[in-house]
Amino acid sequence: IYNTNLIIDNQGKVIGKHRKLVPTWAEKLTWTSGDGSSLKVYDTAVGPIGTLACGENTNTLARFTLLAQGELIHIANYISLPVAPPDYNMAEAIKIRAAAHSFEGKLFTIVSCSTISEEIKDALREDVPNVDELLTRKNSAFSGFIGPTGAVIGEPLIDEEGIVYAEIDLEKCIQPKQMHDILGHYNRFDIFDLRVNIAPTRKITFVDNHEDFNKR
């Protein structure tokens, strides 16, 4: 509802959430922006997990913020985009972004992407007779695993609904970091300085005689 990813642990407990920082394109008709308070990495039984939603996986600063907190497993979720320009390969674009983050951070990325099912098209058909023409196209969705070398692990799903399985070994993040660790020896923090505002944004504050109601 709020353009938000939930982090759920292996006990079924919600341990965190991340609201998309900037709604993309038509999303602006429904949602507003998130804030830096949810740019967090969570310790889980399988390793440190961070997440970003859809197009914000292109945001280099947001991605680095997660990497700097020790992220080793990145969750990236996307929507299928059948309304993209005809020459735009959405599946490839998703894979490129996931591979870039995995290669830069020397970590694993798990990608999940929605698909346009026949049920969705059937639900729209009465009001949108040309729904097949509008929503049927190849290479609109990619779901799969990307390793720390930027290579795909296992068999991804392209334009299909299903579950992708792959085995990941966090020790495989070590050797690549020995070559290029942008969080340590392979960076210059005497030159670069990233500041991140993690304060929750308050959309509105009610006051009466200059007294903050929220402090009562």
PLM features per residue range, with description:
Residues 20-34, 160-179:
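A short, polar/charged loop-to-alpha-helix boundary motif
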Residues 5, 16-18:
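Beta-strand scaffold of nucleotide-dependent catalytic cores
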Residues 10-11, 45, 148:
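Short, ordered coil/turn segments that flank beta-strands lining enzyme active or ligand-binding pockets
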Residues 3-7, 40, 143-145, 164-166:
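Short beta-strand scaffold segments in enzyme catalytic cores
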Residues 48, 54-164:
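CN hydrolase (nitrilase-like) catalytic-core segments centered on the catalytic cysteine
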Residues 38-72, 173-216:
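Cysteine/selenocysteine-centered motifs that mediate thiol-based redox chemistry or coordinate metal-sulfur cofactors
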Residues 7-13, 100:
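Basic phosphate/pyrophosphate-binding loop/patch that engages nucleotide-derived ligands
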